[in-house]
From Swiss-Prot:
Subcellular location(s) per record: Cytoplasm
Keyword ATP-binding: yes
UniProt xrefs under PROSITE patterns: PGLYCERATE_KINASE (PS00111)
Recorded name of the encoding gene: pgk
Annotated protein name in UniProt: Phosphoglycerate kinase
Organism ancestry: Bacteria, Bacillati, Bacillota, Clostridia, Eubacteriales
EC id: 2.7.2.3
Major localization listed first in the record, in broad terms: cytoplasm
Residues that coordinate or bind ATP: 202, 321, 347-350
Length: 392
């Protein structure tokens, strides 16, 4: 699906309403990671250079539909101004006559950042009246917030109903193009790596990927449920008892495509300084828990990853936040960095893992969307993408 982008339309002298994703981590009003703001800069800079008035909308945190200065986008306006090297006008609200006047006064080439759209409960309800008020601030709708594309909210979906021209920003285009090609026309062998704690979060992803991949690697806490489905005793490891039958069905459906761990790092307790050892999957001691894949598994997974032409990774191989149980996840990250094919990291924890390993810049693409990436991998239509124009 080739989306139309800002480059395909005339924006000169137009007010362009851009949904960005500035949902950045803050500590005492200070931005601790500006990755998401940086990711939006190419689209904003293009609009400025083409003589548009860029009106930016975003959410930040979960203010629960009430004004809360803790979640103000003011720090984002300051950081964006530094990145662009020009003034960013910060609006005190995201709707209303005062904001409409402020936007109308801006000359071509200006940037306005609206206050947090989630200060209004109507945003997440996709309230038509609220969406119409947002739409008064622009003539063209640009969605550059892949991270919220799976949400049908007023600023991601509702506002589009009021704008005849609806296109993607460069970040949205990149996400949809790269992940879309991986799922619809991958260079093979195509390998997917699925990890994380729960099978229940990833059932639809696994079902969809089994129809597309050559190999599917399963690690993390969810691997325990699959090992239980294979008949292994799993000690005190996290297992979703109500998903064992589902795991068994997926194993039957996937057959030789699915790779499970053959050894594990187990610990006596869920803490970094607990007693730990490496055991085969058929020898987990009673009362112990699996917290990472073992070295034999890490080597086997790495061999498959390095030989792939397309790799998609969603979810860590273990409790990588604790140093003794990070080796499996970091081994996968290193194998992806060594792989000469297309490597895509999608989903919050895997992104944090490649960044912690210092290997993010060696991936073809690190997705900005957690839940959106997951739903994309499930094969679902994303509301924030479905409303955008497609190239003829």
């Amino acid at each position: 699906m080739a989306l139309m982008t800002v480059r395909d339309i005339d924006v000169k002298g137009k007010r362009v309403f851009v949904r960005v994703d500035f949902n950045v981590p803050l500590e005492d009003g200070r931005i601790t990671d500006d990755t998401r703001i940086r990711a939006a800069v190419p689209t904003i800079r293009y609009l400025v250079e083409e003589g548009a008035v860029a009106v930016l909308a975003s959410h930040l945190g979960r203010p629960k539909g009430q004004r809360n200065e803790k979640y103000s986008l003011a720090p984002c306006a300051r950081r964006l101004s530094e990145l662009l090297g020009r003034e960013v006008v910060f609006a005190p609200d995201c709707i209303g006559e005062e904001v409409e006047r402020l936007v109308a006064e801006q000359p071509p080439g200006s940037v306005v950042l609206l206050e947090n759209v989630r200060f209004y409960a109507e945003e997440e309800k996709n309230d038509p009246e609220f969406a119409a008020k947002l739409a008064r601030l622009g003539e063209i709708f640009v969605n550059d917030a892949f991270g919220t594309a799976h949400r049908a909210h007023a600023s991601t979906r509702g506002v589009a109903d009021h704008m005849p021209v609806r296109v993607a920003g460069f970040l949205m285009q990149k996400e949809v193009d790269i992940m879309g090609k991986a799922l619809s026309d991958p260079d093979r062998p195509f390998v997917a790596i699925i990890g994380g704690a729960k099978v229940s979060d990833k059932i639809m992803v696994i079902e969809n990927l089994l129809t597309k991949v050559d190999r599917l690697i399963i690690g993390g806490g969810m691997a325990n449920t699959f090992l239980r489905a294979r008949g292994f005793a799993t000690g005190k490891s996290l297992v979703e008892e109500d998903r064992v039958d589902t795991a068994r069905e997926l194993l039957a459906k996937g057959g030789d495509k699915i790779l499970l761990p053959t050894d594990l790092v187990v610990a006596s307790e869920f803490k970094a300084d607990a007693e730990q050892k490496v055991v085969p999957v058929d020898a987990i001691p009673e009362g112990w828990m699996a917290l990472d894949i073992g070295p034999e598994t890490a080597r086997a997974f790495a061999d498959v990853i390095r030989g792939a032409h397309t790799v998609v990774w969603n979810g860590p191989m273990g409790v990588f936040e604790m140093e003794p149980f990070a080796r499996g996840t970091f081994a996968v990250a290193q194998a992806m960095a060594d792989c000469e094919g297309v490597t895509i990291v999608g989903g919050g924890d895997s992104v944090a893992a490649v960044e912690a390993a210092g290997l993010a810049d060696r991936m073809t693409h690190v997705s900005t969307g957690g839940g959106a990436s997951l739903e994309f991998l499930e094969g679902k239509e994303l509301p924030g993408v479905a409303c955008l124009a497609v190239k003829p």
